[in-house]
């Protein structure tokens, strides 16, 4: 699974979130093992799969990693992919994209290319 999206207000755009809700959903991506009543735990059906996520941020790295405790990463890794059984996750982040030089943007794109070629 490859996701490429900006992070807006510490979330992916609604169209990406909607895709996640529709595609990575039970019973295809995971199912629940019932313990008792309405209580249970997820069992992922995508255990041998890999996820690669490319995200751009308008914020600097310090704000996202320090003040907001990597919230977008934790939401995606734990709340989506781990539930589906995907633990092989490559997460590439590019910070302060609107404010960097064109040379830095070219380095970002080169990193995307290198990551994609190593699939």
Q: Where in the sequence are the language-model features?
A:
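Helix-loop-strand module that forms the ligand-binding subsite of alpha/beta enzymes
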Residues: 1-77
């Amino acid at each position: 699974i490859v996701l490429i999206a900006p992070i807006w207000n510490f979330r992916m755009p609604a169209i990406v979130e909607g895709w996640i809700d529709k595609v990575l959903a039970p019973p295809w991506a995971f199912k629940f093992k019932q313990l008792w009543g309405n209580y249970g735990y997820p069992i992922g059906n995508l255990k041998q799969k890999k996820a690669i996520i490319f995200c751009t941020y308008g914020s600097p790295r310090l704000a996202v990693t320090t003040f907001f405790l990597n919230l977008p990463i934790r939401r995606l890794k734990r709340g989506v992919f781990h539930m589906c059984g995907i633990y092989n996750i490559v997460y590439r982040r590019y910070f302060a994209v609107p404010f960097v030089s064109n040379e830095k943007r070219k380095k970002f794109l080169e990193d995307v290319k290198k990551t994609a070629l190593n699939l």
